[in-house]
């Protein structure tokens, strides 16, 4: 492929060499530079790819894509393409390099503070029940046919995303459903194609910091970029930020929510509380004459489960899907580490969730309180080498909203777990919350199970889908589900 053929969709200038050069491969990782490749110099948070420009020339790269001046050997015949933003350019270059696979797929993108992961799996579940072949890209994993690829980022770099699209097309996928993080939008990872449908779930202050968004206004603005890059936007009418997020949109808009003015809304909401299980049941109604309501049940608790299901239903209305297929798919849906119920006993309920900050823990505990448990038991730790404020806040939230807290270890990283636990205790001591600290996570879970009372709800929070514990730079195998299974087996053997 000639260099020029990769340079469509953005402005560029050839400042050295010849844009007609043949390109054998496209790379953005300096460790993968090969003779004849195009090396895209990306400004990362820790490493600037421009510092490897000279090395690329020496290794025989055919072309560089840069956004600032670079030093090159004077004898090198390398081609240099100057652009305003090399990340933006990389998205278009990657799409061209892989043959624009998204043009032959219907790509559905979901953005929002909460609900992205669950909504992607619900959409995938419904569409597959209706006979479609669906790829998925998200926080937990990328799914291509039978392959499950663990995720590094919620939204992969544009090159990897386009590679996934190509592989999904080759696998025979019709549709791709993906989480679209605000950071991914900010860094242009989803440029180079147009989404068939964009969904907005909700917005709350989060991901504000030196490595993410400067302030809430930037966070909001980045979410809104999705609605200038899709044909149809489906948004939560009930969220206070919806108008701001969709300001300047270039797509048609539809709404979902509990508000009866939404295009699709929930009515007659009922909590489902069965032995060892929690869920929610509601009627789905659509505005317009002749639309007959139908009932769905979701095996996940809380109002946010209604919103996640409504978003999925609203999307699937644009495909050939029967109501009965929606009902069956939702009833059987489960998302790993997202209010995931683990069958342990019909006397109490045990859930695993990824809630790892004060906001998500408060939302979860408030939701579970609606089910009137005998006790609401919260078990969690906090990650090391992260904000200490998060520890104080999570301790205070658990002390205020749970009846009993079991403080334990999460991913201590390079800190001592006992020090992290002390920080959490500082937060909980601001409340009258009863608590115990057990550093070993398996022992902590065993304690919570052994002390459970009939009607209790126990939430094991923080790690969710993770299957490791990070200590001193090493990730050791650890999965809350496996720990629970081991504990139950040990109890059974003890008689």
Annotated model-derived regions:
Residues 1-92, 228, 240, 262-270, ...:
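N-terminal leader/targeting and accessory segments in enzymes
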Residues 3, 10, 70-76, 171, ...:
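Acidic, Mg2+-coordinating active-site environments of NTP-dependent enzymes
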Residues 31, 54, 125, 166, ...:
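Alpha-helical segments flanking ligand/cofactor-binding loops in enzyme cores
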Residues 136, 178, 198, 235, ...:
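Structural beta-sheet core signal
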Residues 10, 90-233, 237, 241-249, ...:
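Phosphate-binding loop of NTP-binding sites
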Residues 44-46, 182-183, 204-207, 239-240, ...:
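Short glycine-rich anion-binding loops that position phosphate/pyrophosphate groups of nucleotides
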Residues 1-14, 35-38, 250, 289, ...:
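ATP-dependent carboxylate-amine ligase
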């Amino acid at each position: 492929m000639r260099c020029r053929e990769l340079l469509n969709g953005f402005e560029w200038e050839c400042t050295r060499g010849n844009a007609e050069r043949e390109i054998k491969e496209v790379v953005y990782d300096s460790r993968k530079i090969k003779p004849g490749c195009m090396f895209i110099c990306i400004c990362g948070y820790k490493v600037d790819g421009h510092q490897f420009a000279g090395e690329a020339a020496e290794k025989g790269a055919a072309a560089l894509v840069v956004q600032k001046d670079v030093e090159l050997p004077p004898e090198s015949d390398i081609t240099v393409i100057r652009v305003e933003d090399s990340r933006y350019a990389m998205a278009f270059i990657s799409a061209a390099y892989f043959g624009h696979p998204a043009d032959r797929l219907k790509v559905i993108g979901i953005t929002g503070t909460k609900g992205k992961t669950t909504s992607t799996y619900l959409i995938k579940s419904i569409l597959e029940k209706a006979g479609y072949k669906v790829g998925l890209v998200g926080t937990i994993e990328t799914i291509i046919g039978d392959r499950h690829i663990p995720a590094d980022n919620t939204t992969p770099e544009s090159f990897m995303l386009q590679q996934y699209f190509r592989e999904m097309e080759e696998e025979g996928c019709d549709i791709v459903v993906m989480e679209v993080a605000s950071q991914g939008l900010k860094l242009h990872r989803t440029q180079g194609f147009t989404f068939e449908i964009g969904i907005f779930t909700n917005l709350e202050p989060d991901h504000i910091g030196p490595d993410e968004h400067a302030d809430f206004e930037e966070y909001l603005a980045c979410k809104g970029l999705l609605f200038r890059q899709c044909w149809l936007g489906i948004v939560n009418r009930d969220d206070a930020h919806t108008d701001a997020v969709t300001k300047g949109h270039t797509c048609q808009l539809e709404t979902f929510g509990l508000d009866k003015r939404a295009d699709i809304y929930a009515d007659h909401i009922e909590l489902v509380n069965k032995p060892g299980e929690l869920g929610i049941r509601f009627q789905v109604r659509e505005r317009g004459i002749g639309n007959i309501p139908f009932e769905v049940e979701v095996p996940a608790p809380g109002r946010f489960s209604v919103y996640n299901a409504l978003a999925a239903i609203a999307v699937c209305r644009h495909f050939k899907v029967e109501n009965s297929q929606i009902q069956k798919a939702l009833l059987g849906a489960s998302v790993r580490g997202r209010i995931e119920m683990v069958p342990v006993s019909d006397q109490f309920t045990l859930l695993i969730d990824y809630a790892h900050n004060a906001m998500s823990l408060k939302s979860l505990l408030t939701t579970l309180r609606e089910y009137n448990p005998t006790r609401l038991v919260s078990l969690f730790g906090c990650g090391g080498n992260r904000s200490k404020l998060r520890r104080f806040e999570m301790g205070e939230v658990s002390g205020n909203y749970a009846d009993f807290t079991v403080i334990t270890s999460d991913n201590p990283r390079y800190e001592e777990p006992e020090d992290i636990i002390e920080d959490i205790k500082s937060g909980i001591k601001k409340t009258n919350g009863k608590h115990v600290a057990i550093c070993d996570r398996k022992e902590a879970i065993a304690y919570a199970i052994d002390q459970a009372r009939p009607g209790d709800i126990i939430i094991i929070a923080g790690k969710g889908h993770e299957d490791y514990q990070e200590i001193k730079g090493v990730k050791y195998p650890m999965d809350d589900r496996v720990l629970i299974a081991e504990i139950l087996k040990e109890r059974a053997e003890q008689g």
